[in-house]
Amino acid sequence: MNSDRRYETIKKAGWLVLLLLIAVWPFCAEAAGIRMVSVAGEKVNLRKGPSTQDPIIWELGKGFPLKVIGSKGSWLKVSDFEDDVGWVYKNLVSRKPHLVVKTNKNTRVRVNIRSGPGTKYEIVGKAEYGVVFETLERGTGWVKVKHEKGLTGWIKRSLLWGW
């Protein structure tokens, strides 16, 4: 009987640990140093190194999402949805969530933007590879987004990169 009580105690403790892990899981990526940012300015340079003296790799547009993979002083080492790596000055990015269309790179096929979170909803627009959206709301498998020109709708999450 004594071993039965110990088993029940261990079982309850296991469930408690599992519930705790589920509760803190969304914060683990941030705690591990994995975080996302988006370009705050209209045109921000992605550079080869953490200095204005380093060559420019790309010029990034407003809202472009980036994953932070390191830092040095006032500079962030980032990667984009195509796995390009470079450096941006940290005052030129924000924590406002954005997404970019990541599918159909080598085709002219565009993704559907819908009036609601599902394929049953009306198509209100289309977007091609590389188009950036502000993230408004997250649903199950779908994200409500807004384009800089005002179009708002839902896109299947698996077609996008960012947060």
Locate the predicted segments by residue:
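N-terminal secretory signal peptides that target proteins for export/translocation
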Residues: M1-I10
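Sec/Tat signal peptide C-region and signal peptidase I cleavage site
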Residues: W25-A31
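Bacterial N-terminal signal peptides
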Residues: L16-W25
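Boundary regions of SH3-family modules and the immediately adjacent low-complexity/disordered segments
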Residues: A32-G41, S51, P55-W58, P65-K72, ...
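Beta-loop motif signature
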Residues: V39-V68, G73, N106-G141
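Residues at secondary-structure transition points
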Residues: L20-L21, P55, L136, L159
